[in-house]
């Protein structure tokens, strides 16, 4: 599910921030989302994030320096993937009281958060696409 949230988040970022009538549905934004997810998990585990951050920075440098690569899709995927993973990991502890923090309740909160992020990503893409084509 994190993959799909990042995929749609990257596509929405392209539609919001790229000039012109650009569409994107490449998997690279989703892959960046998985890198963001790994970063969140590493930070939660209190392990040194140096390796993950290095990989992300190297890939972002490639995104900036190589022609025809959508930086907006990559950054959008990274942000939405990290946000989706943070929602799964941190939100249940924030929303649920200590007595109701069962695995089942935490799972429900995480899934609802993922669905909300997915709807936001798709909604942003639809709004951006509609305004780019003159429908809004």
Question: How would you label these PLM feature ranges?
Answer:
Residues 1-136:
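A detector for small-residue-rich transmembrane helices and their helix-helix packing motifs
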């Amino acid at each position: 599910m994190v993959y799909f949230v990042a995929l749609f988040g990257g596509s929405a970022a392209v539609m919001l921030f790229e000039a012109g009538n650009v569409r994107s549905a490449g998997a690279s934004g989703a892959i960046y989302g998985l890198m963001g997810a790994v970063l969140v998990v590493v930070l939660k585990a209190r392990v040194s994030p140096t390796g993950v951050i290095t990989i992300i920075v190297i890939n972002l440098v490639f995104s900036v320096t190589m022609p025809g690569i959508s930086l907006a899709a990559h950054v959008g995927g990274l942000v939405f993937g990290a946000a989706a993973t943070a929602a799964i990991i941190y939100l249940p502890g924030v929303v649920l009281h200590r007595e109701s923090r069962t695995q089942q309740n935490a799972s429900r909160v995480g899934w609802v958060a993922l669905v909300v992020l997915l709807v936001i990503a798709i909604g942003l893409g639809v709004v951006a696409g509609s305004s780019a084509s003159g429908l809004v």
